[in-house]
Curated annotation (Swiss-Prot):
SMART domains: PUA. It comes from the Bacteria. Residues 9-88 form the PUA domain. One of its GO terms (molecular function) is RNA binding. InterPro entries: PUA (IPR002478), PUA-like_sf (IPR015947), PUA_sf (IPR036974), RLMI (IPR023542), RlmI-like_PUA (IPR041532), SAM-dep_methyl-trfase (IPR019614), SAM-dependent_MTases_sf (IPR029063). This is Ribosomal RNA large subunit methyltransferase I. The lineage of its organism: Bacteria, Pseudomonadati, Pseudomonadota, Gammaproteobacteria, Enterobacterales. It is found in: Cytoplasm. It is an enzyme of class 2 (transferase). It comes from Salmonella typhimurium (strain LT2 / SGSC1412 / ATCC 700720). Belongs to the methyltransferase superfamily. RlmI family. Specifically methylates the cytosine at position 1962 (m5C1962) of 23S rRNA. Its EC number is 2.1.1.191. Its main location: cytoplasm. The gene is rlmI.
């Protein structure tokens, strides 16, 4: 496409000196960096981003209601945002997933991990021949038709299901959406395979897109710690860690969650893998409350898995989240036998690995126990983190030996 025929986009002009992050190819423009918008742009529409002197920097999506005023689609001035653009991005992402799927024997994985795959606000998980789509930004929603067309080109045999029913959309002025887009409706529970486990996924009603694919490697790593051990699996959801613990030869695993539906699926997952159901206990309760009750009754465990939901959504909540993480890890440490293992995680993007490690150290001091950090975890390799967007590393975890 020549310069004369290239689409003319509205221009977002940055204040003087506020272009540095874009020059380092960070994909966000915050409201404080914006001087003005030249031309009219609807919510999610494509805009050009320029410095205060008019020098072109990037092309992105406009979101006037968000603190993130623009999310960058491309740093290539010659690249138009159209079906061909999304097709290229999908095929680039698929190359890595193809290698992973073949290497690890996967039938389910994250196909698109937002900014780290060059598609800000777009999450796509593949479960067998179902593609589960989440559009989390105004730009992603604006380009919905182009993205779906590209998906149909790249994956003609796959059904597409929309799970854009997440509250973060409201921050950018968008309604929540859910339902089939193309192809058949997913079954109530779809079986997938992961590291030798068969697991049932609730695409339509489960958390996020139905299953936490990002913890795949952590679930596998659990097996090395659990042989002949008594395991407590907190915030168990549908039992991925529990099934992995049983496959690792644990003596007992107690799974705790507030959702009876999730616990019912966890039980089915144990049965589906033909594991000893008598070694699995399922408890519907609040984890904080139950841990305190266990402490009062002198219960002890050899391994505790702590995989809570996100405690922090924004910086104003960070201090409160730190207290929550410290309290719950302190309780877990108190329940472990000497030499026991704590596998603890945080999926809060604002919680850095260094801060999380400090919180665990503080929790150990409050519990009156010494702790050794023996292994570190992050999201699985189908959730890459592009170097210019460190915020993409949201999941972090540690294996800790409690003395």
């Amino acid at each position: 496409m020549t310069e004369s025929t290239f689409p003319q986009y509205p221009r977002l002009v940055l204040s003087k000196g506020r272009e540095k992050s874009l020059l380092r190819r960070h994909p966000w423009v915050f409201s404080g960096a914006v001087s003005r918008l030249e031309g009219k742009a609807n919510l999610g529409e494509t805009i050009d981003i320029v410095d205060h002197q008019g020098k072109w920097l990037a092309r992105g999506a406009w979101s006037p209601a968000s603190q993130i005023r623009a999310r960058v689609w491309t740093f290539d001035k010659a690249e138009s945002i159209d079906i061909a653009f999304f097709t290229r991005r999908l095929r680039q992402a698929q190359q890595w997933r193809d290698w992973l799927a073949k290497k690890d024997g996967l039938d389910s994985y994250r196909l698109i991990a937002g900014e780290s795959d060059g598609l800000p606000g777009v999450t796509i998980d593949r479960f067998g021949h179902f593609l589960v789509l989440q559009l989390l930004s105004a730009g992603a929603e604006y380009q919905r038709a182009a993205l779906i067309s590209a998906l149909q080109t790249c994956y003609p045999d796959c059904a597409i299901y929309d799970r854009s029913d997440v509250a973060v959309r409201k921050k950018e002025g968008m309604a929540l959406t859910q339902g089939p887009v193309t192809g058949e409706l997913p079954p109530a529970l779809l079986p997938i395979e992961e590291h030798g486990m068969k697991l049932l996924v609730d695409i339509q009603g489960g958390h996020k897109t139905g299953y936490y694919l990002d913890q795949r490697d952590s679930r596998l790593a659990t097996r090395r710690y659990v042989e002949n051990q008594r395991v407590l699996n907190c915030f168990s959801y549908t039992g991925g860690f529990a099934v992995s613990a049983l496959m690792g030869g644990c003596r007992q695993v107690v799974s705790v969650d507030t959702s009876q539906d999730a616990l019912d699926i966890a039980r089915q997952n144990v049965e589906l893998n033909q594991l000893d159901l008598s070694k699995a206990e399922f408890v519907r309760d609040d984890v904080f409350k139950l841990l305190r009750a266990y402490r009062e009754h002198g219960e002890k465990f050899d391994v505790i898995i702590m995989d809570p939901p996100k405690f922090v959504e924004n910086k104003s909540q960070l201090m409160g989240a730190c207290r929550g993480y410290k309290d719950i890890n302190m309780l877990a440490i108190q329940l472990l036998n000497p030499g026991g293992i704590l596998l603890t995680f945080s999926c809060s993007g604002l919680m850095t690995s260094d801060l999380f490690q400090k919180i665990i150290a503080d929790a150990a001091i409050d519990a009156g126990r010494d702790v050794q950090f023996i292994e570190q975890f992050r999201q699985a390799a189908d959730h890459p983190v592009i170097a210019t967007y460190p915020e993409g590393l949201y999941l972090k975890g540690f294996a800790c030996r409690v003395m």
